[in-house]
Regions:
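Acidic/polar, low-complexity extended loops/arms that serve as protein-protein interfaces
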Residues: 1-130, 150-156, 161-169, 173-175, ...
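Short active-site loop/helix that positions an aromatic residue
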Residues: 140-149
Length: 211
């Protein structure tokens, strides 16, 4: 659905509540959908293992399988976040809808509270309840040191522990990853609504062996 079109007070490109008197007919309405084109690509990890190693080490097969699954998961995350399109997936950092917000008075990769507020303010209202922060791992200390002084002489820290070992910022979850660009480069801190990112998986991950 074209859920971001609210022109004329309607939703989904044309649905709007009408108030009618008893017995009066309701006007016919039509919503609008958006076309999404998905291009299939194949992701592969090829590993050459000698039969001696596979036979002599009892747990090697299971260990290799776990390693491959972890590498595939990390590879998919990398594609969906930083993929450049073409032969790769088109990641969120390189999507046409990405909006870059410059920091205010930022230097040496410092994060300013004004920067965080600008990013949250540019998020579409419908996405503010679903969005998450993605942050470079090296931003952890910098984000923990962002604070807002109050008139009473106290300070407020926008990033807080969520009680489950994670963090939230302005009420939204913060996920740290090493996939994002280095601190100080564009994309080291991202606010994204993943409900607007489409992924089509034609089949589940399979592990195949050949002698």
């Amino acid at each position: 659905w074209d859920s971001f079109d609210r022109s004329g007070g309607s939703l989904y490109g044309g649905l709007k509540l009408e108030m009618v008197s008893e017995g009066d007919p309701a006007g016919k309405q039509a919503a609008r959908v958006r076309a999404i084109e998905l291009t299939a690509k194949t992701g592969v990890i090829y590993v050459d293992v000698s039969s001696e190693l596979a036979e002599d080490v009892y747990i090697f097969g299971r260990a290799l399988e776990n390693a491959l699954r972890g590498a595939i998961a990390y590879g998919l995350d990398t594609q969906f976040i930083a993929g450049r399109g073409g032969a790769e997936a088109l990641g969120i950092l390189n999507a046409d809808c990405a909006i870059e917000v410059s920091g205010t008075g930022a230097s040496n990769g410092a994060v300013q509270y004004e920067h965080i507020v600008k990013m949250f303010g540019r998020m579409h209202p419908a996405g503010r309840r679903r969005c998450v922060w993605l942050a470079n791992n090296d931003l952890l200390e910098k984000l923990l040191n962002v604070y807002i002084p109050t008139t009473e002489g106290n300070v407020i820290f926008p990033m807080q522990l969520d009680g489950r070992g994670g963090y939230t910022m302005l009420g939204r979850p913060v996920i740290f990853t090493d996939i994002l660009p280095a601190v100080g480069e564009g994309g080291d801190l991202v606010l994204v609504d993943f409900s607007q990112y489409a992924v089509g998986l034609r089949r589940e991950v399979t592990l195949e062996r050949s002698n």
